[in-house]
Regions:
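Alpha-helical bundle regulatory/interaction domains
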Residues: 90-204
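N-terminal low-complexity or simple alpha-helical regulatory segments
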Residues: 1-121, 143, 168
């Protein structure tokens, strides 16, 4: 199961693409758009992946998941987001995220690795055979970017963004949003940034 809150922008985005969200949502087992207003509502992980995949196909927007994630921040994580916002420094906040994300996301794991001067904040889907995992990963990386900017302030930027999926035909939406070098077909989806940010006090 996953929280539905990170997908909260789906209905509005569909409308912006000229698509009535109600029939599409019902086809995926979601009663109506009101469901997205319940911050504590959940859905099966596979359902979320299928929904994002269908949205990308219907809108002819292969980076639909990225757009959804751009409109989400730590608040969509519920109690986990609250832990992040109350953390004294960046590494404490990220450790809270890594440790507690499984409370709301039973289909993927979040990790924080440090190698030399680099830190890697990543997201890995571990449920096999789920449709739309590329969309899910794009969404997660966009939310992660927003979380890091919230924790570190507007001067934070990743030194590289790594995405597991194939190189898209149009990388401009990714370049414009992440404002960092991009690496596709990566082993894991992750935000790479200087580890010197980790002991910094949070900017909340």
């Amino acid at each position: 199961m996953i929280r539905i809150a990170p997908l909260g922008a789906v209905p509005a985005l569909l409308r912006e693409f000229g698509i009535d969200p109600e029939p599409l949502l019902r086809a995926h087992g979601i009663k109506d758009t009101e469901t997205f207003k319940d911050q504590e509502a959940t859905m099966p992980f596979a359902m979320g992946g299928r929904l994002l995949k269908t949205c990308a196909e219907r809108t002819l927007c292969p980076y639909f998941g990225l757009l959804v994630g751009q409109r989400a921040d730590s608040s969509v994580l519920g109690s986990v987001g609250l832990l992040l916002r109350n953390a004294p420094d960046v590494i404490t906040a990220l450790n809270e995220l890594v440790t507690n994300l499984a409370l709301h996301d039973r289909g993927a794991t979040c990790f924080l690795d440090i190698s030399g001067n680099d830190a890697f904040l990543g997201y890995e889907v571990y449920v096999h055979g789920v449709a739309g995992t590329d969309q899910v990963s794009d969404l997660a990386m966009a939310v992660g970017w927003n979380i890091m900017r919230t924790l570190c302030g507007p001067t934070w930027l990743p030194s590289e963004v790594r995405l597991r999926h194939e190189h898209p035909l149009d990388i401009e939406p990714y370049r414009r949003y992440f404002n960092a070098p991009l690496k596709f077909n990566a082993e894991h989806s992750s935000l790479v940034f200087p580890a010197s940010w980790l002991p910094q006090p949070t900017q909340l």
